[in-house]
Amino acid sequence: NEEEKVKWQPDVP
């Protein structure tokens, strides 16, 4: 899911 991605890329572009 997307949570697995956001763990290494918080909210930085």
UniProtKB/Swiss-Prot annotation:
One of its GO terms (biological process) is defense response. GO terms for cellular component: extracellular region. Expressed by the skin glands. The keyword DNA-binding does not apply. It is found in: Secreted. The modification Proline amide is found at P13. Keywords: Amidation, Amphibian defense peptide, Secreted. This is Electrin-2.2. It comes from Litoria rubella.
